[in-house]
Amino acid sequence: MSEKLANKINDKIEKLPRFSQIADKALIAEKERSLSGEPSEDHGLHDPKFAKQILQMTNFTTYGFAGNRAGSFETEAFLGEDVLRGVLLAFSLREFVDRELHAYGLGKGEFWEHSMNCALSAWMIATKVAYDDLEMAFVAGLMHDIGKVILDEFLSEEREKFVDITSQGYVTPVEAERTIFGVDHAEIGAQVAAHWGFDEKISEAIRCHHEPELAVQDPDLVTIVHLADCISVSLGLATQEKSLIGLLSSDFSGLGL
């Protein structure tokens, strides 16, 4: 990556509002509802309808939450406070994430949907394997592709080259990013997470979600996010990176899958 491009990307990341500023809007709204005198269980983190709304905004029925299983929305497992904090974070991030990513061929709403489906998939996998931090799994899944929001602006200028490289069939979009820029959306996403002050394990999960074998701090978390991403893509919940399925790691024995 040229020094000029690196400076442009770093400048764009540095100009992002601090995550505390983004989240404060949601937290202030939650506090105002609490001060309204209405029962706390009817709002925000304790509201089953709040969680259900998240699921209804995605294609999560694909995973079995449909029909006569609608009651699953209100299970104690899903309504655990750890996961609901992640749901609040999702609402905090929605304005930032819910946008068209032209270079990646994603219309408005598609990137948000994929991010949410990956977050929910990561939560399900983490629950299945008794991972000890469901909130971290949810958040890492939610933010795994956040670097695309930054890179899309620069990739749009190289859209023709990007399409030409990936259309050959043997080069993945991630490899195409590296060919064009010398960096990929995963690395940029890790920098965004660090800028926002997220746990280093989340930064690693973002950085390594295409290459889980490179994980050092928390290989289980990285593998969970990698698998969640692959599941979401394989079910048609993203229009790009379909070749990612071919990269699905075969050894998940450490997770007990």
Please report, for each region that a protein language model flagged, where it lies by residue:
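Short, intrinsically disordered, charge-balanced linker/junction segments flanking boundaries
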Residues: 176, 252-257
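Conserved alpha-helical "signature site"
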Residues: 1-163, 167-246
